[in-house]
UniProtKB/Swiss-Prot annotation:
Lineage, highest ranks first: Bacteria, Bacillati, Bacillota, Bacilli, Bacillales
PANTHER family membership: MITOCHONDRIAL RIBOSOME RECYCLING FACTOR PSEUDO 1 (PTHR20982:SF3), RIBOSOME RECYCLING FACTOR (PTHR20982)
NCBIfam families assigned to the protein according to its UniProt record, in alphabetical order: frr
Organism: Listeria monocytogenes serotype 4a (strain HCC23)
Broad class of where this protein is predominantly found: cytoplasm
Function, as annotated: Responsible for the release of ribosomes from messenger RNA at the termination of protein biosynthesis. May increase the efficiency of translation by recycling ribosomes from one round of translation to another.
Bridged cysteine pairs (disulfide): none
Protein name as it appears in the record: Ribosome-recycling factor
Domain of life: Bacteria
GO CC terms: cytoplasm
Gene3D superfamilies according to UniProt: 3.30.1360.40, Ribosome-recycling factor
Entry keyword set: Cytoplasm, Protein biosynthesis
Entry keyword annotation includes Protein biosynthesis: yes
Family: Belongs to the RRF family.
Pfam family, one: RRF
Name of the coding gene: frr
């Protein structure tokens, strides 16, 4: 039962790390990345449909995204959605595809993005700490019910802390890599 608590905690912590990686992938770092458009949806026959499900998104150059819709009639809607979004990008519509040029980031914008990255990382760390707290509470319940001894509680508590430390270290590494990518000129 207590090993189950550890494995569930490890799984949840890994999910928190993966969520951070996905979230940081949507932050524009001056390089073209198809995940920039992940949060973008277009009204398609009355349903909000993600752009990546209605178009092929490729990266032909380091600073350009090429959006080729499967249905050419939706091209204008995708263009409007990009213009309305907070991406700050202007699409170039040539009638069959959209080209998105990713401009160089200003120093000020880089600093804003680094702050955003740190905020996201802190939220991930809080999530990991909450998972640790839940695991410790679960272990204490097991000890109270007599399923594990006090020594086991201490030992498993140390294991939970090791998992937490490892996860926080991974989050710091992910964050550091993203910050370096943003600050790279």
């Amino acid at each position: 039962m207590s090993k189950e608590v550890l494995s569930k905690s490890k799984e949840k912590m890994e999910k928190a790390e993966q969520a951070l990686t996905r979230q940081l992938g949507t932050i524009r770092a001056g390089r073209a990345n198809a995940s920039l458009l992940d949060r973008l949806s277009v009204d398609y026959y009355g349903a909000a449909t993600p752009v990546n499900q209605m178009a092929s998104i490729s990266v032909p150059e380091a600073r350009m995204l090429l959006i080729t819709p499967y249905d050419k009639t939706i091209l204008g809607e995708i263009e409007k959605a990009i213009l309305k979004s907070d991406l700050g990008l202007t699409p170039n519509n040539d009638g069959s595809v959209l080209r998105l040029s990713i401009p160089q980031l200003t120093e000020e914008r880089r600093k804003e993005l680094v702050k955003e990255v740190k905020k996201e990382a802190e939220e991930a760390k809080v999530a990991v700490r909450n998972i640790r707290r839940e695991a410790n509470e679960e272990l204490k319940k097991l000890e109270k019910s007599g399923d594990i001894t006090e020594d086991d509680l201490r030992s498993y508590g140390e294991d939970v802390q090791k998992l937490t430390d490892e996860s926080i270290k991974n989050i710091d590494s992910i964050t550091k890599d993203k910050e370096a990518e943003i600050l790279e000129v």
